[in-house]
Amino acid sequence: MNRLAVELPGLSLKNPIMPASGCFGFGREYAQFYDLSVLGAIMIKATTKEPRFGNSTPRVAETPSGMLNAIGLQNPGLDKVLAEELPWLEQFDVPIIANIAGSTMEEYVEVAAAISKAPNVHALELNISCPNVKKGGIAFGTVPEVAAELTRLVKEVSAVPVYVKLSPNVTDIVAMAKAIEQAGADGLTMINTLVGMRIDVKTGRPILANGTGGLSGPAVKPIAVRMIYEVSQAVSIPIIGMGGVQTAEDVLEFFYAGASAVAVGTANFIDPFVCPTIINELPVLLDELGIRHISECTGRSWKTGAHAVHCRS
């Protein structure tokens, strides 16, 4: 028995560990270090219809317990991803989760319809943190009704299951998750980065050229765990958790909160071997805790009588 194997909509994972979108490119750099086939899945970099060159530099800044980024969805565009990146990944025995993004609902639909037909794409990850240019730049993922409509439209054209990536920058992430589930999403991934800023005390100006950026790394882990804990009790679709994961212990914490698989993001920049290291350490940790199979851990914190905290300071 493979005690790390996980079955999710569209995904038969040999283990629940995968690199998060935006922290692994299309895998070419990391393939120099290890065989990507050891991974449970690969979440590729966000793909848009046309190539994007990203924001002006500087667009990355360190923080005491993580990093800020304002890359701006730099990517080679749909045609090149279909012609070069996805075919290159076919050499590895690993399912691909294609992260898609857009400025309009029409762009999302066009990208989803095309990329979901690639032979090694087993699921889509819908990045709803993008600004909606037809609605004054408000992100798709901040209004439940808009996120639900986008989910419905993508589901109608996708040839594979659709997972929606939730933004933590919302008033009520549980309401958002419920709306997206009702719209037909097959699963959720969470959390995306939190909006943050650093200022250079010598110049008095923001360090990032964009002003603000997405905060990731260990600093966001407690927020991710709390949000997964709350959302997993409110929906019936599976959650792929992410946000500050660095160790096998972190993975188990996310499972206990309610995740069914886990993506590793910023830690890949610190240690390119972090994913295979976690995969190797998980069985040892399960042995220490007397756990037969990783799936037994999903939601253990609330299934065993723990209570959600409703009063927040």
Curated annotation (Swiss-Prot):
Binds 1 FMN per subunit. One of its GO terms (cellular component) is cytoplasm. Pathway: Pyrimidine metabolism; UMP biosynthesis via de novo pathway; orotate from (S)-dihydroorotate (NAD(+) route): step 1/1. FMN binds at residues 21, 45-46, 99, 127, 165, 191, 217, 243-244, 265-266. It catalyses: (S)-dihydroorotate + NAD(+) = orotate + NADH + H(+). Its EC number is 1.3.1.14. Pfam families: DHO_dh (PF01180). The keyword Coiled coil does not apply. Its cofactor is FMN. One of its GO terms (molecular function) is dihydroorotate dehydrogenase (NAD+) activity. Substrate binds at residues 45, 69-73, 127, 192-193. One of its GO terms (biological process) is 'de novo' UMP biosynthetic process. InterPro entries: Aldolase_TIM, DHO_dehydrogenase, DHOD_1B, Dihydroorotate_DH_1, Dihydroorotate_DH_1_2, Dihydroorotate_DH_cat, Dihydroorotate_DH_CS, Dihydroorotate_DH_I. It is found in: Cytoplasm. The active site is at residue 130. Belongs to the dihydroorotate dehydrogenase family. Type 1 subfamily. Catalyzes the conversion of dihydroorotate to orotate with NAD(+) as electron acceptor. This is Dihydroorotate dehydrogenase B (NAD(+)), catalytic subunit. It comes from Geobacillus thermodenitrificans (strain NG80-2).
